[in-house]
Regions:
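HIT superfamily nucleotide-processing domains
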Residues: 2-197
Length: 197
């Protein structure tokens, strides 16, 4: 079914919204780039650019709080807590789901930098990752926060243990291979498949 946006009045409502209006009413061509969560993909699914990679490569200006061979750190444009720092690997890793066992030293470095930059009591520190589809940018980034949160909404957004937010320790455990192995051991079909091999 094709929805006639003209007839529903949506076009008139969006007329003053500039880029959003143009984007919503444009025709998708097979050769169009797709922009999603700070990353531009071409029609073949190849990454063309990434906001956080641009910061790491200094092709887009961003005031960095820290930089070394592995990571950069900076303040987000909309902080959620008293202190809020993003620690980002220079190597493009899309999300926590793309981490592998060999990434655990990188995760440890991200934590080390986060703790060093926060300089606050551990009881007020939260280190967490948002889980897709709730992540804001498709480039792995650790949220290092010193509570209190700036609003109740931010407290909810960064509630560890919810489907959208995982603790640093939980993600590291999973990336180390221990989490995947534990899940595999608890799935009867996986046990049966291993026994048949």
């Amino acid at each position: 079914m094709h929805l006639n946006l003209q007839a529903t009045g949506v076009i008139g409502t969006l007329a003053g919204m500039g880029k959003l209006s143009k984007w919503l009413t444009r025709k998708q061509r097979p050769d169009d780039d797709i922009v999603s969560k700070g990353v531009v993909w071409n029609a073949r699914g190849e990454m063309q650019s990434c906001l956080f990679c641009d910061f790491a490569n200094h092709t887009k200006e961003k005031e960095l709080l820290y930089e070394d061979d592995l990571v950069i750190a900076f303040s987000p444009s909309k902080p959620a807590a008293k202190q809020h720092i993003l620690v980002v690997p220079k190597r493009h890793i899309s999300t926590v789901g793309d981490l592998v066992e060999t990434d655990t030293p990188l995760l440890d470095r991200m934590k080390e930098v986060a703790v060093k930059l926060l300089k606050c009591d551990a009881s007020q520190t939260q280190l967490s990752f948002h889980i897709p589809p709730w992540n804001s940018v498709d480039h792995l980034h650790l949220h290092a926060l010193e509570t209190p949160y700036l609003s109740w909404w931010n407290g909810l957004r960064f509630s560890e243990g919810k489907p959208w937010c995982a603790s640093f320790e939980g993600v590291r455990y999973w990336a180390s291979g221990a989490g995947a192995q534990e899940e595999k051991e608890n799935v009867p079909e996986a046990k049966d498949a291993e026994e048949k091999c």
